[in-house]
Amino acid sequence: MRSMSLWMLIGPVTGIATWASLRYAATTTTSSTAAASTRMGLAPVIALSHGGGPLPLLGDPGHKSIIHSLSHRIPKILSLNDPDRRPRAIILITAHWSTAAPTISGAANPDLIYDYYGFPPETYELKYPARGDPGIAAEAAAAFRAEGLGDVVVDPGRGWDHGVFVPMTLVRPEADIPIVQMSVLASEDPTSHLRMGRALRALRAENIAIVGSGFASFHNLRAMMAMRSSAGSRNPEGARIQAISREWNSALTDVVDKNPWQGLEGWRSLPGADLMHPPRGGEHFMPLIACAGAAHEEEKVRWYTDEYLGVDIYTYYWGGSDVE
């Protein structure tokens, strides 16, 4: 998470997690099947929640539900265990890279950027040796230009931040699927992010999945610390945040389900938006907007929830396999 270490608030945990040993039952809701995406032959789109810093890779108990979903649900949505259906590459839009213009990582073998501080030494030695794909990066840049998105940049030196390697270590520990990383816009302009997603629709037809890595339901560090220190709903402030979170998630899910383009253009007017994502602090919401733009109008969204700090954290997806 940006500009703060949660490690000092949490204390030591159990060490780098053994993914196969983690099991957790969380909530899933399905609004339709994946039939439209299957008919069109499109790779899935997923706006996932990546957790706080490297904590999902440390087995942090507060991330138990998120860890389970990253290591079990997301691979199922992407059909990663089916060699005939798994995507040939992933375009990953990360909340931890904000730029003035749409920017795409063009490196064939990206380094990792350990953009967190105050964590155990082993978190600065993590490796995720998946390849980049300069050809797909160039294709995505051309799609952005065709959409009229301005001065698109392909950055051959940019490494992968923890919005990429932390969730992907859980999603695909084999690290055998190429990844192209994309920035969000510092302007936080929702229409531009919707258009970024729309530009990527054609790449879905080439079996390239689109993954947004953020924290769409809740990314307010001050409120998160209040929830952790107050033991959640046992404190009046925690109960207040939980109530606002429920109202926000209900309104947001209704918008994403029924009117994503117009509704997300006006997302700041949704109840609770400024608490869940403080003004000028909406970067962790932008990947969801781009993912919604990458979905075709006839595709219906599905979602599941994870528990985090006593509130529901939603992951939205279009296409792919249903999960429970």
From Swiss-Prot:
Required cofactor(s): Zn(2+)
Cystine crosslinks: none
EC number: 1.-.-.-
Name of the protein in its database record: Dioxygenase tasH
GO molecular function, one term: ferrous iron binding
InterPro entries associated with the record: Extradiol_dOase_DODA, Xdiol_dOase_suB
Keywords: Dioxygenase, Metal-binding, Oxidoreductase, Signal, Zinc
Enzyme class: oxidoreductase
